[in-house]
Amino acid sequence: GIPYWTYNNGDEPLVAISLLDTSNIANQLDSTPRVFYLGGNPEVEFPETQEEQQERHQQKHSLPVGRRGGQHQQEEDGNSVLSGFSSEFLAQTFNTEEDTAKRLRSPRDKRNQIVRVEGGLRIINPEGQQEEEEEEEEEKQRSEQGRNGLEETICSLKIRENIAQPARADLYNPRAGSISTANSLTLPILRYLRLSAEYVRLYRNGIYAPHWNINANSLLYVIRGEGRVRIVNSQGNAVFDNKVRKGQLVVVPQNFVVAEQAGEEEGLEYLVFKTNDRAAVSHVQQVFRATPADVLANAFGLRQRQVTELKLSGNRGPLVHPQSQSQSN
């Protein structure tokens, strides 16, 4: 669930061995290893699952055009998670030119997982002391999360909270909508239930940009309005791309990338129930912003101007209202 990249800055070839522990407590899926690539056009890494993946891919392309729901199937497919979204949608989400969005989908990239960097990477690294201080602060926060045995007894725990109040919003965009979250930090009883919740309100055409749950499965329930939900798996296939309305449920597996957009006629309001009392979310936009410019340029084959556009113009938070220039592309 945590995005990372590796660069060999030495003079010799590097052989790295990765151990994937699918039985760890954070994994809420099955024991099948899955690798989610944000960029490139990677090959299948686990041959034992390739036959199953090909079968799903054939089933997807055998559907009638009218049942596919979105536009991404009309474009050439890649194997990264962003290839499951259409270029038009990515251009709207990241507020970029359509050419940049097409490169993000990496449909014709023949480099697979490994990219050769000409001239080396120029990266600003944080000082070691800063990293140590951050680790100490995280350890302190973890130690303070234990129950104190006094105010956090079962009998005295608060059991109700209204996360739909506008003033309660954790994230807000006056043109796109708002997001409110309830977890064991704001409602401690959720620790015993191992659940958390998220309330999302999207205005007309508002977008909750592509994101994924690092440590939880989620259940999306529409309470008002209508819109579209897109879900992409580890092979870059859109496993769900359809309109949703009041009363409908959608299950989003852990680490699957999902994006929601409200309709043109009315907004979209929904609740998301998550199977972890402190569910963590990663947003593709924030990942791009935190990734060094040279890494993005080499990974996606972007020019410097496009990297700047992607890191700055398209990263104003996970709630987005499509710009007129993106809509006209």
Curated annotation (Swiss-Prot):
Keywords: Disulfide bond, Seed storage protein, Storage protein
Cupin type-1 domain segment(s): 161-308
Biased amino acid composition, Acidic residues: 129-138
GO MF entries: nutrient reservoir activity
Membrane-crossing residue ranges in chain numbering: none
Start and end residues of each stretch annotated as Disordered: 47-79, 97-149
Family affiliation: Belongs to the 11S seed storage protein (globulins) family.
Subunit structure: Hexamer; each subunit is composed of an acidic and a basic chain derived from a single precursor and linked by a disulfide bond.
Protein name (database record): Legumin type B
Organism from which the protein derives: Vicia faba (Broad bean)
Phylogenetic placement of the source organism: Eukaryota, Viridiplantae, Streptophyta, Embryophyta, Tracheophyta
UniProt gene name: LEB6
